[in-house]
Amino acid sequence: TAVARRTLVRPIRAVGEVAWDESRVHDVTARVDGWVEDLRVTRAGDPVERNATLLRFYSPDLLATQRELLAAPPGGRLATAARERLRLWGMSSWAIRDMQRRQEPRQRIGIQSPITGVVIDKRVNEGAHVSAGALLYRIADPSRVWVLADVFEQDLPHVTVGQRVVVNVSGATGEPI
């Protein structure tokens, strides 16, 4: 019989839950007061692509600031301040340039997903008024998740944070994850 040196594997049974990696969860918030129009992502669980439009948004403040920018002398302090406010409120540089080229303010702006992922929380409905800072969506990247396991005290010496594990989920196909 051949003898070989190998790492001893000791199975540990524990109950736990799968949770989102908190470093891969992104909040999408309203940056300015306004109304939700054309809600495109309608429920938690929906997959989204990075830069996909989640909803379209109408804001009197955005509209007024666009008009300020169009009326201001190009390159002046007023134009620079208006352009910066529009960027801070979520209007893309491309949309600002396009609005200036057309010399017509955009009635609505799109709010895009910051990542490719899954909507894990949707807090907005079509037609709703939202205030600056209000949470609209929470989106998670499912490419890496956490397993939060409740390990018995006698098994603690055999477990380390960040250790690679094989997880079997009861009720699933029985294949390890």
Annotate each predicted stretch with a short phrase.
Residues 1-177:
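Periplasmic scaffold and linker elements that assemble and bridge Gram-negative envelope complexes
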